Swiss-Prot record:
Its main location: nucleus. This is Trihelix transcription factor DF1. Residues 149-201, 220-249, 333-408, 532-603 are annotated as: Disordered. Residues 363-376 have a biased composition (Pro residues). It holds the Pfam family Myb_DNA-bind_4. Residues 381-408 have a biased composition (Polar residues). Plants overexpressing DF1 exhibit very short root hairs. The gene is DF1. Residues 168-178, 189-198, 221-236, 344-362, 532-555, 593-603 have a biased composition (Low complexity). InterPro entries: Myb_DNA-bind_4 (IPR044822), SANT/Myb (IPR001005). Keywords: DNA-binding, Nucleus, Repeat, Repressor, Transcription, Transcription regulation.
């Protein structure tokens, strides 16, 4: 007992004396149980509050026999629990004894179960469980006996020595009850006749040192009241003796708890949502500010680019206007410049001979001509060809803008070219190069809104005239609504007037020089290169009209765009025509009969 209780030797001796001499053992156990309960409530309250977290609500239910065995073991060890300051080893002993009875429970579970049973007993006794009577708890008898034994033992220690026999009788009755309940052996009733005088003071001192009855009642009442809300649920669930009112209270507590928990969760969610919305609004505002600043910068950049483009366009327009004004001044000054001197007279006979060969085929041999040396006409032909090539290849100073213009000419532009060329035809009939003529035509086209230089105008004129020549020389009859050569009527009218003029000049020149008469069935003048020289007296005769080019191109039946073709096709045709002219396919020089007669006479 000294090892379990941990008390002083004097106290142990006094307790032994009281137990063996004056009080029966069951009564001392009951008194010790009350004191031990008060000490357990005082010392282990903090431990219980911490261990409830690990145990949780509910737990494993204890059978009735196991609970009764726990109460019996705890009642037997009441003195040890009363004297011990550390209760851990004592509960380990309780757990070991429970294992001996066949119940496997650790010290912690045993301690918790005893505390819950005792607290529920106090509540039922005080009427705080809502029951009609306090004696409805199934362990009420055992706990009440334990409590009554503790109270009786304490009162016995407080009374005087003469009253001990009466206490013994009462204790005997109580012991009988306890023996019937706990199945304990009967107490020892032997009373010592004399007691040492020294044993009484320690006994009295042992009784007066702890004031456990008052402490246990007050402390346990306060402790059970303060912690009833935290332990009521677990004790009710373990005991299972609650009524409908208890269940309602328990449900009400759970409802309040969950409502408070849900309110906290909802408040937290609302706070998080509010912060989230504030962050989203802040980011949206920042994005709008960035977009607005970017939009302002873009507008400023576009305005700057527009201003720069407007300045460039104005500068380009000013430059173009200055260039146009300069070109107009040059075009106005060029026709007034003095005309260059005509070529030597020996070139004219060959040119006139070429025109006569194209206009009329000879029907009869020409009249005798005065003798003339042969090398002179040949030289004239060569010089004429060279001059023609030089004039056709002239105007080499072509501007890049003109070369970049489109190769295809619209119908309106071609009609404007024909009109300008027709109007200026009479002005440039005199001898001289045709460069000023095409410069003036180019200036006129530019005034009409067509950007074509002199070389392009000249090439286009030659191409459409060549195509007109092919259509004219074809044997097929051209219908009135034909789509080929849409400028046929304009060019035909132009050349009819020109043929009349040239025919009159040729007749006058031939009659004055050689007395030749123009035949009636003369062929109209076909188009020739632009370098045409005035008619002159020649000694050469033309070949029959049968000396035509071997290859004749048929008129095209394509549409307007296909009829005109590109400039490259026309350039190929120019080369073919020049090759034919150089080969002398259209005319040849033949010595006259007069020269032959004179040679014969000389011989």
């Amino acid at each position: 007992m000294m090892q379990l209780g941990g008390g002083t030797p004097t106290t142990t001796a006094a307790a032994t004396t009281v137990t063996t001499a004056t009080a029966p053992p069951p009564q001392s156990n009951n008194n010790d149980s009350a004191a031990t309960e008060a000490a357990a409530a005082a010392v282990g309250a903090f431990e219980v509050s911490e261990e409830m977290h690990d145990r949780g609500f509910g737990g494993n239910r204890w059978p009735r026999q196991e609970t009764l065995a726990l109460l019996k073991i705890r009642s037997d060890m009441g003195i040890a629990f009363r004297d011990a300051s550390v209760k851990g080893p004592l509960w380990e002993e309780v757990s070991r004894k429970m294992a001996e009875h066949g119940y496997i429970r650790n010290a912690k579970k045993c301690k918790e179960k005893f505390e819950n049973v005792y607290k529920y007993h106090k509540r039922t006794k005080e009427g705080r469980t809502g029951k009609s009577e306090g004696k409805t708890y199934r362990f009420f008898d055992q706990l009440e006996a334990l409590e009554s034994q503790s109270t009786t033992s304490l009162h016995h220690h407080q009374q005087q020595t003469p009253l001990r026999p009466q206490q013994n009788n009462n204790n005997n009755n109580n012991n009988n009850n306890n023996s019937s309940i706990f199945s304990t052996p009967p107490p020892v009733t032997t009373v010592m006749p004399t007691l040492p005088s020294s044993s009484i003071p320690p006994y009295t001192q042992q009784i007066n040192v702890p004031s456990f009855p008052n402490i246990s009642g007050d402390f346990l009442s306060d402790n059970s009241t303060s912690s009833s809300s935290s332990y009521s649920t677990s004790s009710d669930m373990e005991m299972g003796g609650g009524t409908a009112t208890t269940r309602k209270k328990r449900k009400r507590k759970w409802k309040v708890f969950f409502e408070r928990l849900m309110k906290q969760v909802v408040d937290k969610q609302e706070e998080l949502q509010r912060k989230f919305l504030e962050a989203v609004e802040k980011r949206e505002h920042e994005r709008l500010v960035r977009e607005e600043s970017w939009r302002v910068q873009e507008i400023a950049r576009i305005n700057r680019e527009h201003e720069i483009l407007a300045q460039e366009r104005s500068m380009s327009a000013a430059k173009d206007a200055a260039v146009m004004a300069f070109l107009q001044k040059l075009s106005e000054k060029q026709p007034n410049q003095p005309q260059p001197q005509p070529q030597p007279q020996q070139v004219r006979p060959s040119m006139q001979l070429n025109n006569n060969n194209q206009q009329q085929p000879p029907q009869r041999s020409p009249p005798p001509q005065p003798p003339a040396p042969l090398p002179q006409p040949i030289q004239a032909v060569v010089s004429t060809l060279d001059t023609t090539k030089t004039d056709n290849g002239g105007d080499q100073n072509m501007t890049p803008a003109a070369s970049a213009s489109s190769s295809r000419w619209p119908k309106v532009e071609i009609e404007a070219l024909i009109k300008l060329r027709t109007n200026l035809d009479s002005k440039y009939q005199e001898n001289g190069p045709k460069g000023p003529l095409w410069e003036e035509i180019s200036a006129g086209m530019r005034r009409l809104g067509f950007n074509r230089n002199s070389k392009r105008c000249k090439e286009k004129w030659e191409n459409i005239n060549k195509y007109f020549k092919k259509v004219k020389e074809s044997n097929k009859k051209r219908p009135e609504d034909s789509k080929t050569c849409p400028y046929f009527h304009q060019l035909d009218a132009l050349y009819r007037e020109r043929n009349k003029f040239h025919s009159n000049n040729n007749i006058a020149a031939s009659s004055s020089s050689s007395g030749l008469v123009k035949p009636d069935n003369s062929v109209p003048l076909m188009v020739q290169p632009e370098q045409q020289w005035p008619p002159a007296v020649t000694t050469a005769t033309t070949t029959p009209a049968a000396a035509q080019p071997d290859q004749q191109s048929q008129p095209s039946e394509q549409n307007f765009d296909d009829e005109e073709g590109t400039d490259e096709e026309y350039d190929d045709e120019d080369e073919e025509e020049e090759n034919e002219e150089e080969e002398g396919g259209e005319f040849e020089l033949v010595p006259s009969n007069n020269n032959n007669n004179k040679t014969t006479n000389n011989l």
